[in-house]
A protein has these predicted regions:
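Membrane-embedded catalytic cores of phosphoryl/pyrophosphoryl-handling enzymes
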Residues: 84-166
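Alpha-helical transmembrane segments in multi-pass membrane proteins
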Residues: 55, 59-63, 67, 152, ...
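Hydrophobic alpha-helical transmembrane segments
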Residues: 31-42, 62, 126-129, 134
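Alpha-helical transmembrane segments of integral membrane proteins
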Residues: 44, 51-59, 123-126, 147-151
Length: 166
């Protein structure tokens, strides 16, 4: 993505989100919804004594840990640092930890954990859509490049597939 494309994309996103009451909350809403669904799912598993709770906790935690370790090793700059243009929403400049996207990786790992526990097609589709919204917002808000989000998705899917098959 070029600087001009980045500016055009974030300005378009900014114009749309400026119309929303509580823009910062609106941008965080899908992530908070994903976390709430995950917590509710874990509570259901806990109260029913379902042993799948172990994988539903461990696999996303491993994914989160792997992504957290990889980010400084890769050291890719975020688009807003690279182009010198602030993103939409809150941000911390100069950290150089863009790839892979931790929000997207976590959302994908949570979606896979919930699909593992509740393998109904409607649940799987809803979680996949929520994950896609979270990843898309990371790009459209200027927090990440598409490659950051795709790397996070791929990594989460591999870790989840391996973790849920062992």
């Amino acid at each position: 993505m070029t600087r001009e494309q980045y500016i055009r994309m974030t300005e378009t996103t900014r114009r749309v989100t400026d119309r929303l009451p509580g823009r910062a909350k609106a941008l965080r809403a899908p992530t908070l919804l994903c976390a709430a669904i995950y917590c509710a799912s874990l509570l259901c598993l806990m109260f029913t004594g379902d042993r799948r709770i172990i994988r539903a906790v461990i696999v996303p935690a491993v994914c989160f840990a792997v992504v957290t370790v990889l980010r400084p090793l890769i050291g890719k700059q975020r688009p807003y640092d690279r182009y010198g243009v602030p993103p939409v929403g809150a941000y911390k400049p100069g950290k150089g930890k863009s790839m892979p996207s931790r929000h997207t990786a976590s959302a994908a790992a949570i979606a896979c954990a919930i699909a593992y526990v509740f393998p109904h097609p409607a649940v799987i589709v809803c979680m996949a859509l929520l994950c896609a919204v979270i990843g898309s917002l990371r790009v459209l808000s200027g927090q990440h490049d598409i490659s950051d989000v795709l790397a996070a998705l791929a990594l989460s899917l591999v870790i989840s597939l391996v973790g849920n098959r062992l």
